[in-house]
Curated annotation (Swiss-Prot):
Biological processes, Gene Ontology terms: angiogenesis; cell chemotaxis; positive regulation of smooth muscle cell migration
SUPFAM superfamilies, alphabetized: Immunoglobulin, Protein kinase-like (PK-like)
Gene this chain is encoded by: pdgfrb
EC number: 2.7.10.1
Positions annotated as active site in the UniProt record: 821 (proton acceptor)
Cysteine pairs bridged by disulfides in the record: 52-108, 153-194, 240-293, 434-503
Full protein name: Platelet-derived growth factor receptor beta
UniProt feature coiled coil, ranges: none
Record-annotated membrane-spanning stretches: 529-549
InterPro entries: Ig-like_dom, Ig-like_dom_sf, Ig-like_fold, Ig_I-set, Ig_sub, Ig_sub2, Kinase-like_dom_sf, PGFRB
Residue ranges, Extracellular side: 31-528
Enzyme category, top tier: transferase
Length: 1048
């Protein structure tokens, strides 16, 4: 009690004295310590009060050799000092019961100006005041600089005489000794000791080793933790690392210091890297907070700090956020992306469900960790269908919490009128019934007009019908089905009408469908009908027969798109094609039907289907291989059978090539016609790009952090980078061709000729992710025909696809073969990113495919057709070059639909005639886009040929890729592949190599382009022919002269 009173009195006395002192301080330096002594000698067990005041807040620091900058706490129960903030600018440091351990330099720092004042305190040993004592240094190291260095041999009594000696030679060193700091001298890289002498007693200090260290201009500290979010009981490690300096001292500010016990450990990682570690084997909630690491380099007095925030949870959590509305409306065939952002710890399990059942089939699910506790999951529905509407739920769980997000998806189907009929009811009533379908449920409005001729051009003359008890009644009913909603509306006229009635339906603003029906009175109607029946019965029958024949002839028929050119006119604008019916068929292609085991349907169209099958006995090296079998439907007409037979003859005469879907065998006898071709397990290129788009974007999102690899506005084209391409087996997703959600039904092969029923074959689900070993055991894989095994879709892959398609088209052009439907949907992906060109029209419902537009009895892919094909019905290999440019646009937009800004109606033609061309895709380099523009030259003679395109695209590829392609091609041609083996006796294809000028820009046409790519066109083609290793001849096709370009 007396001690406390005395201390308060001393503090009051010092405060009054200090106030008087500060009243006279200048504006330059107001920081003062009272008492104003540079050093104080205290008796052991005594007390001391030091008051520091300035013009702003002041703090007390302890300066020592081991901890050059250690901020003292305001209060501490386990230490013999206390700091009291007497006012906003003054603080008092009180020491009591001091001993030799309190020997140190105490610093007062003004926060606003950074000014420092210090006082040295010495406490000699009370029991033996004359005893020599050095303050031990924990490291015994001295850093050498260009000037003086300080050996920190600090004593507890300033009266001790201290001398510095070289430990090895025992020779004294000249210098200056400061009791509170140590011995200052010019030192070498040696070991030194201090000797103290007092009243005849001599004692040596510990040894100090002098080191030379690299001192950077400034230092940076980096703090990281094993986890910034964790649960209590889990281990926690916090590291503070400093690089580029050889020696640095660490100190930590940690949360809840009174509760959390810590003992930092310093580790030297390398000659210029040090780390301080805090290790807590079992973290608690008290460990939550901000950890601040202070690093100090004492040679140049450089300081740095860094911090990290740690959160220790009592239990785990899950928090979710959807990035779009949860009630979603999508148009038919639109791609829908459902995205959920998640914060969770521990790491969550994420599952998607549709209407309570696990999601499977043609949906792409991405789960990506974006931060330590942040995740994102994306469910993508590609080309959404009506049956895919419903509730999609993302279920996120971990061991402590469960959350879910549900999206209600409605697939919008444009309203259309399905049926409009009128009936005469008893009592001279008339009933008009209109049936409309759509999603959301469409509305129906009724209108009438007395003059049909006038109303056709004057929509304002139509009068809306409303229910009237005396004239008419309107009754409407709605039926909701799984795929679409149906509305049935009926108008009943109570009196005979002689008018035109219109049914109009809509379910979207501005989009209306309507139909008209003309009503006549019942009496007049009966007379007209009777007279018509009597007078025109026979003519009607005759006309009906004629109409049926005409309709039957106009009905779209299956036809092979590929055409083989026989001859061309001198001006290059008239072509004669070979009639495939006149080509012979070699029975060597025949295979027994019982060697085929049919499986699931890969694709189905209006005319036929393609079925997966297992073929036995086609190859000597494999007992069975997986194949695709083309066949017609049971309703096929003779002309369609002839078309499929023509396709067989053309494919058999073309010969094998690595980049076309090759013919393997055929069954033409004793049953339906089968074409057995290669099986491409990853489907068409459009779906492949859609399904792997996320790997492309994620790959370059990761790489952008290092070298900005993704092609965009001003970035460096990837074509200028020679990247490494590895080769192995494909494993990027396992997607099947043309597959659906329904389970597959496998159909065994039967020897029942025409009695086989294929209607039961159902579309298959997508295969599970690729498993190479299993696939090879089934006989479907060829490990020596693999281009790339990269699981991600890269820019090099896009170039590789373009290159392989150009190689395949170069082969077809060399055979005078025009594809006429070159598009990404007709390019299939096989094992190892091997690309093959095909004509998949048989298994595609082109009558309901928006990519094909009806014209007469055929359907045309307008967006991919060259102008001369659209407007003049002229098809050449150069019109295929135009289509190749569109295919490049598809590839480098990752599966985009061409001409997204143009409608598919009569407005499509005008921009094309005016020279409209699509803009550069986001992922295409300038070189690739330049090739596209060359392919889209309006004058077809000026377009490059495929040999030139192979050269251009090949120049953008790495040498390793082209070398691997050549090795794969050579392996293919030397293998016992069924397509190669069946043509080896002939040594070549029956079609000749095209005339060097055919189907390519002549020298006159190319002279308009002073581009080095357009030189030596014949040389490119000749080199390509040598690489293919196939000598061509053909007795059916006459040589084709050079086309002459039009003169301007």
């Amino acid at each position: 009690m007396l001690r406390a009173s005395a201390m308060r009195a001393a503090v009051l006395h010092l405060t009054v004295a200090l106030a008087a002192l500060l009243s006279s301080c200048t504006t330059v330096s107001c920081l003062k310590i009272v008492p104003e002594e540079k050093q104080l000698i205290l008796a052991e067990g005594s007390s001391l009060s030091l008051t520091c005041a300035g013009s702003s807040e002041t703090t007390w620091d302890l300066k020592s050799d081991d901890v050059p900058f250690f901020q003292m706490k305001a209060e501490s129960s386990d230490l013999n000092y206390k700091i009291v903030q007497s006012n906003s600018t003054a603080s008092v440091l009180t020491l009591w019961h001091v001993d030799w351990k309190n020997t140190a330099v105490y610093q007062c720092r003004e926060q606003l100006t950074g000014e420092i004042k210090e006082v040295a305190v010495f406490v000699p040993d009370r029991f033996s005041p004359q005893t020599l004592r050095f303050i031990e240094s924990s490291h015994g190291m001295v850093t050498k600089t260009s000037g003086e260095s300080t050996v920190p041999c600090v004593v507890t009594n300033p009266n001790i005489t201290v001398t510095l000696y070289d430990k090895d030679t025992d020779l004294p060193v000249n210098g200056v000794y400061v009791p509170s700091e140590g011995f200052k001298a010019y030192l070498d890289y040696r070991t030194y000791v201090c000797r103290g002498e007092l009243n005849g007693e001599v004692k040596e200090s510990q040894a100090f080793n002098v080191y030379s260290i690299h001192v950077p201009e400034d230092i940076d500290a980096y703090v990281n933790a094993s986890q910034t979010v964790l649960k209590q009981g889990e281990p926690l490690t916090v590291n503070c690392t400093v690089q580029g300096v050889e020696l640095v001292l660490f100190s930590w500010d940690i949360p809840n210091r009174d509760i959390v016990k810590h003992k930092p450990e310093t580790v030297v990682l390398s000659a210029t890297t040090m780390r301080s570690c805090l290790v807590f084997p079992h973290a608690t909630v008290a460990h939550s907070g901000t950890y601040v690491c202070h690093a100090h380099e004492s040679t140049q007095d450089q300081k740095a700090f860094a911090s990290v925030n740690i959160t220790v949870l009592e239990r785990g959590f899950v928090a979710v956020k959807s990035t779009r509305k949860q009630n979603i409306t999508a148009e038919l065939q639109e791609n829908v992306e459902l995205r959920v952002e998640i914060e969770a710890y521990p790491p969550p399990q994420i599952r998607w469900k549709k209407d309570g059942a696990p999601v499977r089939g043609d949906k792409t699910i991405i789960i990506r960790q974006e931060h330590e506790i942040r995740y994102v999951t994306i469910l993508t529905l590609v080309r959404v269908r009506t049956e895919q509407k419903g509730l999609y739920t993302a279920l996120i769980t971990n061991e402590d919490d469960v959350k879910e997000v549900t999206f209600a998806l409605e697939v919008q189907v444009l309203a259309r009128i399905k049926d409009l009929t009128d009936h005469h009811l008893p009592g001279k009533k008339q009933l008009v019934t209109c049936v409309a379908e759509g999603v959301p449920t469409p509305t129906i409005q009724w209108y009438s007009c007395d003059s049909m001729l006038k109303c056709n051009n004057q929509t304002s003359l139509w009068q809306q019908l409303k229910a009237d008890p005396e004239l008419l009644s309107i009754h409407t009913s709605v039926t909701e089905a799984r795929q679409t909603n149906q509305v049935r509306s009926q108008v009943t006229f109570f009196k005979p009408q002689h008018t035109t009635v219109r049914c109009e339906t809509t379910n979207q603003e501005g989009l209306i469908d309507f139909r008209d029906v003309k009503l006549v009175s019942s009496s007049l109607f009966s007379q007209v009908v009777l007279l018509a029946v009597v007078l025109t019965l026979v003519p009607i029958i005759i006309m009906s027969i004629i109409i049926l024949i005409a309709v039957w002839k106009k009905k779209p028929r299956y036809e092979i798109r590929w055409k083989v050119i026989e001859s061309v006119s001198q001006d290059g604008h008239e072509y004669i094609y070979v009639d495939p019916i006149h080509l012979p068929y070699d029975l060597a292609w025949e295979m027994p039907r019982d060697n085929l085991v049919l499986g699931r349907t890969l694709g189905s169209g209006a005319f036929g289907r393609v079925v997966e099958a297992t073929a036995h006995g086609l190859s000597h090296s494999q007992s069975s291989i997986k194949v695709a079998v083309k066949m017609l439907k049971a309703t096929a007409r003779r002309s369609e059978t002839q078309a499929l037979m023509s396709e067989l003859k053309i494919m058999s005469h073309l010969g094998p090539h690595l980049n076309i879907v090759n013919l393997l065998a055929a069954c033409t006898k004793h049953g339906p016609l089968y074409l057995v071709t290669e099986y491409c397990r990853y489907g068409d290129l459009v779906d492949y790009l859609h399904r792997n788009k996320h790997t492309f974007l994620q790959y370059y999102l990761d790489k952008n952090q290092d070298d900005g690899s993704l092609i965009s506005g001003g970035s460096t084209p990837l074509s200028q980078r020679k990247g490494y391409v590895s080769f192995g087996s494909e494993s990027d997703g396992g997607y099947m061709d043309m597959s659906k959600d329904e389970p597959a039904v496998y159909v065994p092969m039967q020897e029942q000729m025409d009695t086989i029923k294929y209607a039961d074959i159902q579309p298959s689900p997508y295969e599970s992710p690729y498993q190479q070993d299993l696939y090879q055991e089934q006989g479907g894989g060829r490990v020596d025909l693999v281009i790339s095994d990269s699981p991600a879709l890269t820019y090099d892959d896009l170039l590789g696809f373009s290159y392989q398609v150009a190689k395949g088209m170069e082969f077809l052009a060399s055979k005078n073969c025009v594809h006429r439907d070159l598009a990404a949907r007709n390019v299939l992906i096989c094992e190892g990113k091997l690309v093959k060109i095909c004509d998949f029209g048989l298994a595609r419902d082109i009558m309901h495919d928006s990519n094909y537009i009806s014209k007469g009895s055929t359907f045309l892919p307008l967006k991919w057709m060259a102008p001369e094909s659209i407007f003049h019905n002229l098809y050449t290999t150069l019109s295929d070059v135009w289509s190749y440019g569109i295919l490049l646009w598809e590839i480098f937009t990752l599966g985009g639909t061409p001409y997204p800004d143009l409608p598919m109606n009569e407005l499509f033609y005008s921009p094309l005639k005016r020279g409209y061309r699509m803009a550069k895709p986001a992922h295409a380099s300038d070189e690739v886009y330049e090739i596209m523009k060359r392919c889209w030259d309006e004058t077809f003679e000026k377009r490059p040929d495929f040999s030139f395109l192979v050269h251009c695209v090949g120049d953008m590829l790495t040498d390793s890729y082209k070398k691997k392609y050549s090795q794969v091609n050579e392996t293919f041609l030397k293998s016992d592949h069924p397509a190669v083996a069946r043509t080896k006796p002939r040594l070549s294809s029956p079609f000749p190599i095209a005339n060097p000028a055919f189907g390519s820009p002549s020298l006159v046409g190319l002279s308009d382009f002073p581009d080095p790519y357009n030189q030596n066109t014949r040389r490119f083609r000749n080199e390509a022919e040598v690489q293919e290793g196939v000598t061509s001849f053909n007795e059916y096709i006459i040589p084709i002269p050079d086309p002459k370009p039009e003169k301007s």
